[in-house]
Amino acid sequence: MYRNQLARASLRSTSSINQIRNMITAQAVVYAQHGEPKDVLKTLKYEIDDDNLDSNSIIVKTLGSPVNPSDINQIQGVYPSKPEKTTELGSNEPVAVCGNEGLFEILKVGDNVSNFKVGDWCVPTSVNMGTWRTHMLCGGDEMTKIPNPEQSKANGKPSGLSVNQGATISVNPLTAYLMLTHYVKLTPGKDWFIQNGGNSAVGKYATQISNLLGINSISVIRDRPDLQDLIKNMTEECGATKVITEEQNASKEFGSEIKSWVKETGGEIKLALNCVGGKNSTGIARKLNNNGLMLTYGGMSMQPVILPTSLHIFKNITSSGFWVTQLLKNDVELKRKTLGQIIEWYENRQLKDAPSKETKFNPSDELSRYYIDGIVNSKGGKQLIVY
């Protein structure tokens, strides 16, 4: 509602720009109907009135915004959380701006905004802000400040955040950290967690974060020709305690080997993180000790989670879903606290970000083309549009 009020006061469609003295020309990637991205995404050009800024609002420019699977699912209409469709940007029909994650720089602040100054970096406080755009007009409370490189340096930190780190901080790193810390108390040096999808972005963040917290990890990965090189990378670069294959995860005989690892530390496997489903999820659930918890945050195999009845009855295993959007939706303070921890690790060079394929936007081009291409190329890795 607040953004709609701001829009009426400070946004103009390109047809009325002759009446305005000082305007910021912007582009956004929008859709009016759900469908396949190549069929429904369009570029909407609009203007932001830089001279008549509401006292409680800010104007930001985008530094980078990624393409996430959830963004694609929103466009297709199959994601539970959907942005509101409006005409606030001057479109002829209600449209939604794509994108949920991104990094922004403050261009201008209203007179009543005290938590930002020009040049600050920020990320959206809530979901469905619509980050696939060049500029945004929003309320000062709709963004959360994160340090820019100059501020990190001034605070004596070894490193400042990169655009990739800032633009991708709100989903994968937060997902990994919250799954490890929000539900089960894991004793450093003793306890373990096990995860499938160990080579995924969230998997690598979870491995690194568990290492920083002193928690032992078991990562399950697919067998491949360069298996030993990958295992070496995950143990030496990410800090994985143990890395096993899907075949070993499914093997009852190999289970005794895992029990010996856990016995050496005097702890338990209390947590399993599942992003695959199917028999793979059964395998990691079987490794849990009594009263263990399995969190499911994805389903890459498109197969249902399968848990034998015996695990529920005799081991009291709990299986729950994890959705970072829902968890943080009504808990802004938890998001800020979690962001602060991830930022600290980035600044101290203790946490490595998942790499993205960066594509530089040319303002003379149609913005939607970059994201349509990014969606196509996302099968080969994370895509980040930088500005």
From Swiss-Prot:
Q: Which CDD domains match?
A: ETR
GO molecular function annotations of the record: enoyl-[acyl-carrier-protein] reductase (NADPH) activity
> Which family does the similarity line name?
Belongs to the zinc-containing alcohol dehydrogenase family. Quinone oxidoreductase subfamily.
Entry protein name = Enoyl-[acyl-carrier-protein] reductase 2, mitochondrial
Record keywords: Acetylation included? no
What range is the organelle transit peptide?
A: 1-23
Report the superkingdom from the record.
Eukaryota
